[in-house]
């Protein structure tokens, strides 16, 4: 029901936020790192579990998703809801041991990631709500360490928002006809496949600009430049392999390219945060 492989989209940026916080506040804490990782897992479980539970009837009608666990009868709706509630409790309980601000904000974070599942019922901007949910990763991890807001992690969050929204538009191309037939909303259903691809590309141009802004504010060095270069190349590459008349590589663009891009970027960026000392951007 929950694809842990998709955690690679947000988890690397949570780690970036964590190490930005460490650099700002000082003092590495293994227990705090574990708590941040657990929060990411519990939030992901809640969001994805709730999406599967809420969309179970829709998924049953869609040939692409009819084999998912709930419509296929492998997991009952009741057991899925128990899984969701347990992860909500674990998420909030874990934030209690981090700091007061994160604990107080935890219900809001859960509300955002769960609200996404409703949005395709009434707005084609649902992809941007998903982006907002994953964008909580870097700022949330930063708050876990420092207990206060700052501009740089917010820029990273905006970067995640645009990046995720753009590739989710590409992913949803597969369901454009189904969405139209069932009265569901998405960018492809609204703008058509060609229009959706153009919008996704424009949003990813904004992502690339935000990468540059983050590097500038961070006083980033060579490692960041290498990581961000690879990230942007992979970002562009996914747009070159998905065509309006050929959607066969959507899953490669969605999963492989973006998963590799986030992990590579985070690895280089974290090294730069911890050990870089010469401005490059």
Locations of regions flagged by a protein language model:
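Intramembrane alpha-helical segments
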Residues: 1, 38, 68-155, 236-243, ...
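Extended hydrophobic alpha-helices typical of membrane-associated regions
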Residues: 206-209, 213-281
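Membrane-embedded alpha-helical segments that form the functional core of polytopic membrane enzymes
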Residues: 13-16, 20-54, 64, 88-96, ...
């Amino acid at each position: 029901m929950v694809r842990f492989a998709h955690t690679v989209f947000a988890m690397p940026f949570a780690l970036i936020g964590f190490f930005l916080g460490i650099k700002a506040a000082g003092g590495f804490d293994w227990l705090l790192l574990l708590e941040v990782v657990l929060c990411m897992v519990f939030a992901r479980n809640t969001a994805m579990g709730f999406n599967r539970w809420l969309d179970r009837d829709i998924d049953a009608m869609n040939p692409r998703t009819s084999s998912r666990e709930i419509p296929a009868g492998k997991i009952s709706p009741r057991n899925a809801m128990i899984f969701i509630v347990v992860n909500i409790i674990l998420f909030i309980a874990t934030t209690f041991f981090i700091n007061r601000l994160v604990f107080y904000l935890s219900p809001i974070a859960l509300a955002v990631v769960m609200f996404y599942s409703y949005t395709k019922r009434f707005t084609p901007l649902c992809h941007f709500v998903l982006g907002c949910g994953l964008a909580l990763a870097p700022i949330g991890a930063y708050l876990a360490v420092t207990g206060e807001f700052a501009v740089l992690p917010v820029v990273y969050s905006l970067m995640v928002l645009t990046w995720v929204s753009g590739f989710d538009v590409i992913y949803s191309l597969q369901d454009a006809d189904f969405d139209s037939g069932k009265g569901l909303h998405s960018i492809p259903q609204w703008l058509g496949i060609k229009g959706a691809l153009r919008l996704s590309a424009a949003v990813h141009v904004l992502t690339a600009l935000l990468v540059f802004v983050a590097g500038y504010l961070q006083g980033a060095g060579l490692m960041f430049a290498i990581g961000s270069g690879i990230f942007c190349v992979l970002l562009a590459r996914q747009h070159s392999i998905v065509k309006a008349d050929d959607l066969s590589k959507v899953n490669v663009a969605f999963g492989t390219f973006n998963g590799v891009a986030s992990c590579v970027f985070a690895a280089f960026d974290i090294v730069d945060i911890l050990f870089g000392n010469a401005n490059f951007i």
